[in-house]
């Protein structure tokens, strides 16, 4: 999915029957297309329709799901928009360090306490991510003054957008967890349906208010390959939700964390190969510091869970 995100945001598309190429600039339309993913929305709706008698009563007011949708939509917009200013590998390493904002939001939203080990892990991950980010900005020094100023402004813009993404993305699961904890417990399909529905409504209102819905559709209709890329991105997002839920249900969150970490590492190398990004030796050190800490944490959680089951 990351491949298509980067391709749509950073690569120009050729107009049909012409040699002219243009960039697709409306990140919000991509958020709308992803949240419109019929697979998640329709299947959740059908499941609720046919199984409503066996599902728990929906206790939380429906408007509470709009908070999840709002943070989810804004975090996705920040993620797509940031690709205009920072590379996909830089963005992925920053996303891997979202443990820190997740802990902050967990403390604020759910009053959760964290252990010393978790604080140390968070510090190591932030340290590695900072090294990786600074290694990419150090390459700016080799540019001319005007080019350097432009690159610095882009790096700052990308950093601000990634901070927005991390904070909003950290709020989303903590708020969902809070809703899930209210008895009787919500079913996953109820959560998926409500969040996707509110997200579609929020994006549609914003696109109509800005007048960019029709211009984005017009761009897609006049340029080659972008429709297929948007479709694959949307389907990847939808089936990704299903994959996450099935993995957690069958194998547990530890296996999911390991798979997601491996996916992130592979996506960085895949992006570097396909889009010509360069990573310095210092950048590789920061990269392996971040993902090494994450893998060690996953392994320690696995050992703890295994020990509890054997008792």
Residue ranges of predicted features:
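Polytopic endomembrane small-metabolite transporters, centered on the Drug/Metabolite Transporter
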Residues: 1-311
